[in-house]
């Protein structure tokens, strides 16, 4: 039986530090290579066989993972925060980091994190780019208001971004000079252009063969629209990786961390260790969901009487996560259980 060789990779923008050890911890090779596909191909030809590798999750890990995956017996990605706690040291450099990652992999002590498939990651990149466009549209709309206010121009803020009102405002308001009018037109054209691109991206994702059926099932849940459904499908990936709804709620950042010692139990505010894209989308969806679901409206009212509106919104968001997990696991359209109907 061939012995396995273990490789730790410390990945950076331009360089990758590596460390190769056998099962007994004997060092076979270490060094540094350029972070390019060609250099990785040359490097892999020098490796002893068979080999498995591990790297820390960074913004550069995706393409390296995809390039090495076909050649490795096993390839893992480590959770950065957990790995930092395990491999804490006074002395730290790229060579030592690669060696520690290699030892964690060799001893089966690597805090592995989930790596979505290439297809999901490519589509997720598109969705996150769409979120960037939305933020830029909001910035342009705020800039339009700021330009008008700093020039002392009166306007109707509820109608400002309506096409007809905006055109009429530019044409008839005497307080808008030619220089300001040009800037306002450019801002408006930017908003329109970004809106068209954003709409086209959402249409392409909704009609994507990999997502169509899944998104349609998720949208059967009251209060879940195309953006929430797409965000869930692409940020979660494989829903089976969550063994319980509580773990899914934690991943979405809808609960606080616990700090307990002795008889003292302390719950912190919402944890920063979460998927921020899912957290934002689910909280926004939870604000609208009670309008479409009597059971969610009842839950919101009950929680609001106990505390404040934010806690009620979080309770609805957690219930939405439970619905999303159930529909995604069962691969069926949403339906309310009989006991929930009776409770409502």
Question: Language-model segments: which ranges?
Answer:
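Phosphate-backbone recognition surface of nucleic-acid-processing proteins
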Residues: 217-220, 226, 230-309, 344
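Low-complexity, acidic/Ser/Thr- and charged residue-rich accessory regions of DNA metabolism proteins
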Residues: 263-264, 299-344
């Amino acid at each position: 039986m061939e012995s396995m060789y273990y490789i730790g990779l410390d990945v950076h923008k331009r360089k990758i530090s590596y460390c190769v050890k056998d099962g007994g911890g004997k060092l076979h090779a270490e060094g540094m290579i350029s972070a390019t596909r060609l250099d990785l191909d040359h490097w892999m030809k020098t490796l002893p066989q068979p080999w498995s590798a591990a790297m820390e999750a960074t913004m550069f890990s995706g393409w390296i993972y995809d390039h090495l995956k076909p050649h490795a017996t096993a390839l893992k990605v480590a959770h950065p925060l957990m790995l930092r706690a395990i491999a804490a040291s006074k002395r730290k450099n790229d060579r030592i980091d690669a060696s520690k990652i290699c030892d964690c992999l060799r001893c089966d002590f690597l805090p592995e994190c989930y790596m979505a498939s290439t297809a999901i990651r490519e589509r997720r990149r598109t969705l996150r780019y769409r979120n960037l466009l939305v933020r830029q549209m909001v910035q342009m709309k705020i800039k339009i208001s700021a330009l008008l206010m700093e020039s002392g121009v009166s306007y109707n803020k509820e109608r400002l971004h309506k096409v007809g009102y905006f055109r009429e405002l530019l044409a008839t308001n005497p307080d808008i000079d030619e220089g300001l009018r040009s800037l306002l037109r450019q801002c408006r054209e930017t908003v329109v252009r970004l809106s068209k691109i954003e709409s086209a991206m959402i249409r392409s994702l909704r009609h994507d063969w990999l997502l169509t059926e899944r998104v349609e099932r998720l949208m059967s849940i009251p209060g879940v629209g195309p953006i929430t459904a797409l965000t869930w499908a692409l940020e979660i990936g494989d829903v089976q990786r969550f063994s319980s709804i509580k773990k899914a709620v934690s991943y979405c950042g809808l609960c606080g961390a616990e700090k307990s010692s002795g008889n003292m139990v302390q719950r912190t505010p919402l944890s920063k260790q979460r998927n921020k894209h899912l957290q934002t989308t689910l909280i926004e969806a939870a604000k609208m969901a009670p309008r479409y679901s009597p059971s969610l409206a009842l839950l919101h009212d009950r929680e609001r009487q106990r505390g404040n509106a934010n806690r009620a919104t979080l309770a609805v968001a957690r219930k939405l996560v439970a619905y999303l997990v159930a529909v995604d696991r069962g691969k069926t359209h949403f339906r309310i259980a009989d006991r929930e109907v009776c409770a409502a």
